[in-house]
């Protein structure tokens, strides 16, 4: 029964995308079908097949080892504030976001910059991009951007496409925005993992976002023009560093900007949520609903969607609330509020944890529209009006991609 509910959830999400399509007659069943199959296959390999699960577990172990090295750098700056004694001192509540999550983002961004400098990332992107392009019957630039989003976030996509943004047609531009919103950056993945989110889920969600972003981009905005971009004019960085030291330093400074942005937004929005909850609770108290909050309202509104995705009805309000927080605010705040349920002795079952973990794994939120419009407009001011028009539709496509990955995850966890 649960498995069939997950299948129903996939159908519902596809139906929503079809209804939102701007040109239903031009939808390519070849591309849409291949993207859906690839998204399901990646989910099955990572979550259901023993070899795939083994690989995911090993990668997760490696990520945790990387995080341990990040803690070494944090400890040099903050001393015992990142040590295990903090948990003892504060009775298990010694995890400080600013001392554990933000330094990890800086470290991993520097590491990724080094990997780009020595050519590892470029080779991976070119190989995977070529395979992806043939499998899904999409343009080379679309496959390039989709694969790049495994490693980089939506903030970096404009810099990547800048050398040829004038040659991008409207559909390719839309796909680039969707892919960025549907994915997460490697640096922020470390941040989510530091909050207790299972790394194997984050890794699987990141990989599934590749075909997922293409799937819903092509459903909502089918391709109607031929591509004018080839792999011969792709550039991985706008101004390549001249040495490995410069690459590390540049990456660290970029990581600092990302960490500062994350800290600023999370701090502001947590405070804003507290204010909103105070207002809602105060007004609700006049009518006997003193405990009403933004989270509870979002939970009620999105609970049916969470249920059809595979979440038990008893947990649907919580899942709906977290999905709503991610959409209205951002994924960091949602994961932050999800974190207590991931602790030892949590009340959620494995399937619900997986579905929520996947559903929150992406940059798709209303704030991202502003980020995308601002970032793309900076490299292509003349296309700013067009980018602004695509923003809301791209958010819908990216959100559906995240929810589809979550539904597929629930399907395979239910089979296990």
Q: Predicted segments — roles?
A:
Residues 1-11, 100, 292-294, 356-366:
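Structural signature of hydrophobic alpha-helical transmembrane segments
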Residues 45-81, 230, 276-301, 314-322:
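Interfacial/capping segments of alpha-helical transmembrane domains
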Residues 126-160, 226-247, 294-298, 326-327:
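Juxtamembrane inter-helical linkers in multi-pass membrane proteins
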Residues 135-194, 320-408:
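Alpha-helical membrane segments and immediately flanking helix-loop junctions
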Residues 253-344:
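Transmembrane helical segments that form the transport core of multi-pass membrane transport proteins
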């Amino acid at each position: 029964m649960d498995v069939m509910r997950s299948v129903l959830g996939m159908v519902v999400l596809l139906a929503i995308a079809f209804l939102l399509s701007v040109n239903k007659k031009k939808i390519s069943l070849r591309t849409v079908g291949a993207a859906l199959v690839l998204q399901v296959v990646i989910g099955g390999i990572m979550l259901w097949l023993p070899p795939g699960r083994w690989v995911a577990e090993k990668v997760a172990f490696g990520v945790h080892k990387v995080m341990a090295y990040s803690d070494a750098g944090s400890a040099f700056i903050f001393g015992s504030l990142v040590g295990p004694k903090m948990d003892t001192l504060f009775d298990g509540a010694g995890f400080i976001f600013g001392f554990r999550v933000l330094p990890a983002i800086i470290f991993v961004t520097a590491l990724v910059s080094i990997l780009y400098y020595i050519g590892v990332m470029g080779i991976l992107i070119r190989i995977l991009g070529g395979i992806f392009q043939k499998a899904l019957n999409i343009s080379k630039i679309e496959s390039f951007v989709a694969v790049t989003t495994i490693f980089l976030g939506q903030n970096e996509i404009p810099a990547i496409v800048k050398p040829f943004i004038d040659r991008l047609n409207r559909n390719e531009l839309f796909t680039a925005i969707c892919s960025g919103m549907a994915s997460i950056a490697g640096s922020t993945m470390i941040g989510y993992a530091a909050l207790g989110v299972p790394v194997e889920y984050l890794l699987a969600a990141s990989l599934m976002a590749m075909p997922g972003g293409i799937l819903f981009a092509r459903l909502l905005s089918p391709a109607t023009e031929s591509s004018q971009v080839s792999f011969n004019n792709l550039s991985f960085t706008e101004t390549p560093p001249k040495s490995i030291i410069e690459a590390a330093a540049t990456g660290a400074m970029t990581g600092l900007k990302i960490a500062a942005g994350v800290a600023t937004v999370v701090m502001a929005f947590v405070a804003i949520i507290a204010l909103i909850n105070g207002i809602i609770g105060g007004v609700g108290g006049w009518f006997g609903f003193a405990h009403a909050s933004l989270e509870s309202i979002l939970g009620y509104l999105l609970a049916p969607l969470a249920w059809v995705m595979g979440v038990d009805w008893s947990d649907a309000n919580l899942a709906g609330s977290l999905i709503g927080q991610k959409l209205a605010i951002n994924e960091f705040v949602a994961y932050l509020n999800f974190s207590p349920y991931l602790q030892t002795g949590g009340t959620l079952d494995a399937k619900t944890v997986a579905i929520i973990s996947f559903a929150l794994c992406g940059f798709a939120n209303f704030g991202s529209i502003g980020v995308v419009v601002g970032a793309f407009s900076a490299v292509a001011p003349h296309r700013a009006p067009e980018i602004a028009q695509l923003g809301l539709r791209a958010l819908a496509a990216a959100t559906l991609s995240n929810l589809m990955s979550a539904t597929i995850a629930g399907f395979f966890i239910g089979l296990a």
